[in-house]
Amino acid sequence: MGVRASGTTCLPFIRILFLAVLIGAAPVAALAAPRAVATSTATAIASQAAGVASVPTEAVGRPSPTRISSGDTAWMLTSTALVLMMTIPGLALYYGGMVRKKNVLDTLAQSFIVTCLVTVLWYAIGYSLAFTHGNAFIGGFSRVLLHGMGKYTVTTLSGAVPESVYMTFQMTFAIITPALIAGSFAERMKFSALLWFMSLWLIFVYSPVAHWVWSTDGWLARLGALDFAGGTVVHLNAGVAGLVTALVLGKRRGYGRDAMPPHNLVLTVIGAALLWVGWFGFNAGSALSAGGRAGMAMVTTQVATSAAALAWMFVEWAARGKPSVLGMVSGAVAGLVAITPASGFVDPTGALLIGIAGGLVCFWTATYMKNFFGYDDSLDSFGVHAVGGGLGAILTGVFAVKAIGGTAGALEGNIGQIGKQLIDVGAVLVYDVVMTYGILKIIDAVIGLRVSEEEEVEGLDLSQHGEQVYE
């Protein structure tokens, strides 16, 4: 595996990426414009009595809502802020507390810079590839550089909120997904390689998968697979990519021999708490309206998270003699992950069972299975997110309630729904493995993925950033 000085690769990265996006995307948008859907952005007419604005319809091949709800829009703006908080500072602190003290700044920087990088890429091309009309596998170019998106533009996907709000809400999902991957390769990837990997992975993995599952054109959406808030699109996707990255990079120096305890569990607990609160925007916000379904998603999220934290705590207590704080917060995150695809489809009892299953299964995969196979999934991104997301997606097909989400699960006689969920999980897993591996090998051949042994021993805070938190 080639190792090169990471500092020499940042300038070419910036030149190539941003010149290509900001200069090259404009002609693409111009070429796509004749085929782009017509968009009207005329001024809204206020409806004072109902608090709703009447707006022109965006013609995207089928009728769109013609009214913007101020209440729904306010809820979606709030949810967007909550989900962004999940990454910065939530995930940054959660991961930052679990690494060794010589790598904490690099870990925090990963979440922070991924937020910045994905924001620009989502604006430039990612949103268009994920959520515009194209084919069953990928969207088109009609929203490159957000071309044609106006102040009052609405779409069939955005419902009764402006498309700009829907786009930004989806941006926060696109931000946290690659940020989650970093939990598997913490403490050993070059920062320059991280920038390249996150950029290519967003465009070639996340955007297509989001289109499959959440776009009205997507083949998994048309199949009838259920994923309310990202069990496969976000968590399975990120966790599988994390495992592939961990295997390609190899283990940390001294893994299995040297002690590598979390340097500050207080940061991790604070981060987990921020993730928990932000997850209400993640799940309940995915209803895209401030109504009964959002309320039920909030209830199921709270119940499943609490059940999973308790399940993890008790099984760890029985297995190891003491309940650890890290185990409690890991169980809570496992429950949040497991309920994500099901939160808008199941009732509280189904959520309780999904939470318990998520806590127990993720405890096993993050401890015994990882130790048995010997891979270095540093912060258990695979063990919690891939396993929890996949498990939750499958159990959605079991516990879905037609009166809540419009689709019955196996317990209501729709046994075939489990098959659709399995296809969803399998398709995302296979595509993710192949594409992630290819992206990593290309980057490794060009600039190298991993820091040198000396840099790893010194710590990534100093070797990659020239700074340190602790003297």
Predicted features along the sequence, with ranges:
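N-terminal secretory signal peptides that target proteins for export/translocation
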Residues: 1-11
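Bacterial N-terminal signal peptides
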Residues: 14-26
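Intrinsically disordered, low-complexity regions
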Residues: 19, 28, 457-459
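N-terminal signal peptide c-region/cleavage motif recognized by signal peptidases
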Residues: 25-27, 33-34
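Glycine- and aromatic-enriched membrane alpha-helices
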Residues: 33-471
